[in-house]
């Protein structure tokens, strides 16, 4: 215990000598030890002595004192991390699984038909739906025929679905007629209804005779 106190006293004296401008003053140079390095060294010694304290979390209003580019990393799904004040708590990488997706997901257990539309850079060889129309009608028909993988239920019509059948079903339906005339702009205009912050316009009928 006496040796620990002697080491701690020596470190404190050395730190005071470095930080006190009355003892020595020299401009900051690249070779000079930074305050962060000193704090890290002191924390490591205190941790070995068994008297380390958790690191101090500064308030949010002191964030403006930071210099240089800053970045925030972390989260539950960014790989292995070490949590806790001393970084000694390893995290567990969670699996992205849902209620309808088995946790032992392998290559022979994929999403049933219909496959999802192909993202950028993918083709039909990757098991996705290529050249899918970007329309509400196609999306509605697609969702009606879509099923998730559920080992507890059996879909008898699962193997009957195919892309050609969906396209034929869409082409056979009635298409929505496109209107070139807005019916809400027809008829006599109401002159007493004006837009906000606009100059009111009165018709010739409402003008008083001079």
Swiss-Prot record:
GO CC terms, sorted:
extracellular region; nucleus; secretory granule
Phosphoserine, modified sites: 139, 203
Supply one GO molecular-function term.
Answer: enzyme regulator activity
Q: Which residues cross the membrane?
A: none
What UniProt keywords are attached to this protein's entry? Chaperone, Cleavage on pair of basic residues, Disulfide bond, Neuropeptide, Phosphoprotein, Secreted, Signal, Sulfation, Transport
Q: Which Pfam families match?
A: Secretogranin_V (PF05281)
Q: How is it modified after translation?
A: Proteolytically cleaved in the Golgi by a furin-like convertase to generate bioactive peptides.
Where is it located? Secreted
**Signal peptide positions (record):** 1-24
Do the record's keywords include Chaperone?
A: yes
The UniProt entry's GO biological process terms, in alphabetical order, are:
intracellular protein transport; neuropeptide signaling pathway; peptide hormone processing; regulation of hormone secretion
Disulfide bond residue pairs? 118-128
Query: Which domain of life does the UniProt lineage start with?
Result: Eukaryota
Q: Which family does it belong to?
A: Belongs to the 7B2 family.
Q: Main role?
A: Acts as a molecular chaperone for PCSK2/PC2, preventing its premature activation in the regulated secretory pathway. Binds to inactive PCSK2 in the endoplasmic reticulum and facilitates its transport from there to later compartments of the secretory pathway where it is proteolytically matured and activated. Also required for cleavage of PCSK2 but does not appear to be involved in its folding. Plays a role in regulating pituitary hormone secretion. The C-terminal peptide inhibits PCSK2 in vitro.
How the protein assembles, per its UniProt entry? Interacts with PCSK2/PC2 early in the secretory pathway. Dissociation occurs at later stages.
- Protein known as: Neuroendocrine protein 7B2
């Amino acid at each position: 215990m006496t040796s620990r106190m002697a080491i701690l006293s020596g470190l404190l004296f050395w730190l005071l000598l470095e930080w006190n401008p009355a003892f020595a003053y020299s401009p900051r140079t690249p070779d000079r030890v930074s305050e962060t390095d000193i704090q890290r060294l002191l924390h490591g010694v205190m941790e070995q002595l068994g008297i380390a304290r958790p690191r101090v979390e500064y308030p949010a209003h002191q964030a403006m004192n930071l210099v240089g580019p800053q970045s925030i990393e972390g989260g539950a799904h960014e790989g292995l991390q070490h949590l806790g004040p001393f970084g000694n708590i390893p995290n567990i990488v969670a699996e992205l699984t849902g209620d309808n997706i088995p946790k032992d997901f392998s290559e022979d257990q994929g999403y049933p038909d219909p496959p999802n539309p192909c993202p950028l850079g993918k083709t039909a060889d990757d098991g996705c739906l290529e050249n899918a129309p970007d329309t509400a009608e196609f999306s509605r028909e697609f969702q009606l025929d879509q099923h998730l993988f559920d080992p507890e239920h059996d879909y008898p019509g699962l193997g009957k679905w195919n892309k050609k059948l969906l396209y034929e079903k869409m082409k056979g339906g009635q298409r929505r007629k496109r209107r070139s005339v807005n019916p809400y702009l027809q008829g006599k205009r109401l002159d007493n209804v004006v837009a906000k912050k606009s100059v009111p316009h009165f018709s010739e009928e409402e003008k008083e005779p001079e």
